[in-house]
């Protein structure tokens, strides 16, 4: 794991419920935790290619928290709204409750589902994480039966 990602993961695990994301499946055998680490890694790769003045700390932190909704979206619940349209808001609410977020981190979390949700990101970091999220979701979904080799997590994801 990149140093900035490792450092940020350690801080989020120490100060909030970040580790709980390991319990929830995201795409195939990938946990939400694995997915968020993959998105942070891909966002850094995109940022390196794009260049320019970017807040790399906010980029990584927002990427790691973009799916901080903390529930199993594969299990239907009658009172829970449609996951695709509402999980970004739930992730943002949980992240605000557990962490102090910068405006850039809030933008990343709230708008990563563009264009499914029609409000686009306002920051370059938000656009990068939105793109990284879609790239990782596609890769994870298409390799859904493959064990996760992209993160250091050793436990088998349900």
Please report, for each region that a protein language model flagged, where it lies by residue:
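Metal-dependent phosphohydrolase cores
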Residues: 1-158
């Amino acid at each position: 794991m990149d140093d900035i990602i490792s450092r940020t993961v350690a801080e989020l695990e120490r100060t909030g419920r970040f580790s709980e994301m390991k319990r929830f499946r995201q795409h195939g055998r990938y946990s939400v935790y694995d997915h968020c680490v993959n998105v942070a890694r891909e966002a850094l790769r995109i940022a390196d290619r794009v260049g320019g003045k970017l807040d790399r700390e906010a980029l990584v932190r927002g990427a790691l928290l973009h799916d901080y909704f903390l529930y199993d979206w594969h299990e239907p619940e009658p009172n829970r709204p449609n996951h695709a349209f509402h999980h970004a808001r739930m992730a943002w609410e949980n992240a605000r409750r557990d962490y102090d977020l910068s405006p850039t981190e809030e933008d990343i979390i709230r708008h990563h589902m563009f264009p499914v949700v029609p409000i686009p990101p306002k920051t370059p970091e938000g656009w990068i994480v939105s793109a990284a999220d879609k790239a990782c979701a596609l890769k994870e979904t298409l390799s859904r039966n493959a064990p996760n080799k992209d993160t250091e997590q050793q436990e088998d994801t349900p």
